[in-house]
Amino acid sequence: VDEIFEDLTTEHPFLASIGMRTTGLRTKFLKSETSGLAVWGKIFGEIKGQLDATFSEEESIQNKLTAFVAVPKDLENFGPVWVKRFVVTQIEEAFAVALESAFIIGDGKDKPVGLTRKVGKGTNVVDGVYPEKVASGTLTFASSKVTVNELTDVYKYHSVKENGKPLNVAGEVTLLVNPTDAWDVKKQYTSLNANGVYVTALPYNLNIIESLFVPEKKAISYVAKRYDALIGGALNISTFDQTLAFEDLNLYAAKQFAYGKAKDEKAAAV
């Protein structure tokens, strides 16, 4: 049911921001790191400049998200289309909440590795659980000048990959905050312009997104394109009309395979 994922991206701004990709159900997928430069030289000179690519096999898309809904058979009297919409709506919200939670705070054990978890080389993973990141700094938004300095540090942190390679992150950094804290920031940077319209503007066009899964007084900065949020295969909803026959219920079971993990330690910060 493709409409479920369309609704996810419109109703949950965080899921829209990371750009979930449907890859099809595959057991492994490849990642690559490229190096080398094209080299200038004289006409008729020798060909130089070797380009290298290192491929690595990532873990399988093996995290399964499941949910089920049991509804009275009598509901069919209201029409099968209505019943389907009722079931889809419930599953839609359950999957949206579960995916958002996992992509933000998931510990990696039978679920995606969230933005708040360490993924750098040498990270000690115990029984499938990735350790939590420690706070890398403090954002106060105390004044315009202080805010510029604080956000400059955030952008500079994300502008270099873990392997030391520079990265252009202009317009690519998002700050994920609890809805309560978002209003404190908006209040500080909302003003009335010459046209009599209130506008909210932050340095460097920083994008702020709210999520209930971010603890109060904490913020997560991330570069969305550097987090792999993959959906494996189509959502599968099965109907069982005999499983709960004595209870006079129809059972709808849904499952979806997903994978989530930052490309390296510098993709996100707490």
Describe every region a protein language model picked out:
Residues 56-154, 270:
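Alpha-helical scaffold segments that mediate packing/assembly in large oligomeric complexes
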Residues 117-246, 250, 256:
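Extended oligomerization regions of viral-like shell subunits
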Residues 248, 269-270:
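Low-complexity, Gly/Ser/Thr/Pro-rich intrinsically disordered linker/tail segments
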Residues 50, 100, 218:
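Active-site and NAD+-binding cores of ADP-ribose-processing enzymes
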Residues 40-43, 81, 186-190, 218-221, ...:
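Short conserved micro-motifs at the rims of enzyme active sites and ligand-binding pockets
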Residues 1, 72, 176-181, 223, ...:
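Helix N-cap / beta->alpha transition motif
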Residues 1-68:
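Assembly/oligomerization interface modules of large self-assembling protein complexes
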